[in-house]
Amino acid sequence: MKITWLGHSGFRIEIEEAVLLVDPWLSGNPMFPIERRDEAIAGATHILLTHGHGDHSGDAVAIASELGLPIVGIYDLVTWLQSRDGVDGIGFNKGGTVTLDGARVTMVHATHSSSIMGEAGPVYTGTESGYMIAGEGHVIYASGDTDIMADMGWMGEYHRPDIGILAAGGHFTMDMKRAAFAARKYFDFRTVIPCHYRTFPLLEQSAEALRQGLPGVEVLEPEVLEPITI
């Protein structure tokens, strides 16, 4: 399994036979070297969106159209993109599971907001979500944009993820201290990878508080386009 950060909240996850592009915002992303776009999307099989905000869905339609990939996500968002842009899609909802080239992806709750920019302004695109991605003997919890929530209790107990990809930059999501608290209280991670940080000055620039709050857990600060092999 390989997990590669695309900057901000974007990831390339190679698991089983799937290559998932999670929240691929590349164009205009100050963390992403746009000259390496082809490398980042090569071989992708699916695009997985946590919600509609432009810093998560920004390049989804362009990549889906270019490579002929389905966009996978909450039903409201996916059907809207299908109607507007003619892309392929797999829409489902919280509690549902889809199998994507051997990887089992279950949609779980998050607490944030979700809209996408339409011609007349923001369009509501269903609720925000996270994902449990299972394969190769591991379960990855990709939190999406969220704060701490009580639902993390049953999510951790039921799905038992060993890898956490946690939005932890503060301001729009939980910060590093809150993410560490959530991980300690609700999960038993072996590895935690922070995201949604370093992109803009108002977000946290370091994961040191996360590391200090999770003794005994491997906290990996990702570098853009440098694969993490699990």
UniProtKB/Swiss-Prot annotation:
The species this protein was found in: Cereibacter sphaeroides (strain ATCC 17025 / ATH 2.4.3)
Pfam family, one: Lactamase_B_2
Assigned protein family: Belongs to the UPF0173 family.
Molecular function terms from GO: hydrolase activity
Name of the protein in its database record: UPF0173 metal-dependent hydrolase Rsph17025_2229
PANTHER family, sorted: UPF0173 METAL-DEPENDENT HYDROLASE MJ1163, UPF0173 METAL-DEPENDENT HYDROLASE MJ1163-RELATED
Disulfide bridge map: none
InterPro entries recorded: Metallo-B-lactamas, RibonucZ/Hydroxyglut_hydro, UPF0173, UPF0173_UPF0282_UlaG_hydrolase
Keywords: Hydrolase
